Amino acid sequence: MAKFIQHIGLVAPLDAANVDTDAIIPKQFLQKVTRTGFGQHLFNDWRFLDDAGKVPNPDFVLNLPRYQGATILLARENFGCGSSREHAPWALTDFGFKVVIAPSFADIFYGNAFNNQLLPVTLSEADVDTLFQLVKENEGIEFVVDLEQQTVNAGGKSYAFEIDPFRRHCMINGLDSIGLTLQHEHNISAYEKQQPEFLR
């Protein structure tokens, strides 16, 4: 996994609360088990006016020219609620998002995001309100999300966020569960050598 230390990116404001996983990636697109190819179906029922996904909805935020290429999604409370599907962070990352900022996240989505190198940043509702206003008033504004410092820098101000130290360590060092295990490979090998022959 790639290391996540700091990210600078264009911000897209999704001004809706309780965005569930079925809105993020509708169930009809869940047949695949690989992590790629889901970005084209991200927010499918909102991004497109037809079932085939060929007629863009000109009013949806991700279709607006000013937000093309956004890598930071600004959202409202309880983002990622609904059914447990890892496809939701897969779709967001495949579309190009690196960070989601919101006042709160559904627990399962929150964990799945970290497992897929998508950083969920929790800020207060007041701070998120300020950031929405900032994005709407300043076309092309970029945020600096610094995981080492645990800050979001925008509009000349810094907004601090909390994060579990273990998850922070994993993202900064680009470690998934396999990478974490390999960090202790020498200890595992030493333990195995101490075992009786028939257990090796």
Swiss-Prot record:
Q: InterPro entries, per this entry?
A: 3-IsopropMal_deHydase_ssu, Aconitase/3IPM_dehydase_swvl, AconitaseA/IPMdHydase_ssu_swvl, IPMI_Swivel, LeuD
Q: What is the reaction catalyzed?
A: (2R,3S)-3-isopropylmalate = (2S)-2-isopropylmalate
Query: Which GO molecular function terms does the record list?
Result: 3-isopropylmalate dehydratase activity
Q: In which pathway does it act?
A: Amino-acid biosynthesis; L-leucine biosynthesis; L-leucine from 3-methyl-2-oxobutanoate: step 2/4
Gene Ontology biological process terms from the UniProt entry: L-leucine biosynthetic process
What EC number(s) would the UniProt record show?
4.2.1.33
Indicate the enzyme's highest-level EC class: lyase
Q: Which UniProt keywords apply?
A: Amino-acid biosynthesis, Branched-chain amino acid biosynthesis, Leucine biosynthesis, Lyase
- The organism's place on the tree of life at top rank: Bacteria
Report the Gene3D superfamilies cross-referenced here.
Aconitase, domain 4
Name a GO CC annotation attached to this entry. Answer: 3-isopropylmalate dehydratase complex
UniProt lists the family membership as follows: Belongs to the LeuD family. LeuD type 1 subfamily.
Q: How does it assemble?
A: Heterodimer of LeuC and LeuD.
Job of this protein: Catalyzes the isomerization between 2-isopropylmalate and 3-isopropylmalate, via the formation of 2-isopropylmaleate.
- Could you tell me what this protein is called? 3-isopropylmalate dehydratase small subunit
Annotated organism of origin: Yersinia pseudotuberculosis serotype O:1b (strain IP 31758)
List the top taxonomic levels of the source. Answer: Bacteria, Pseudomonadati, Pseudomonadota, Gammaproteobacteria, Enterobacterales
GN (gene name): leuD
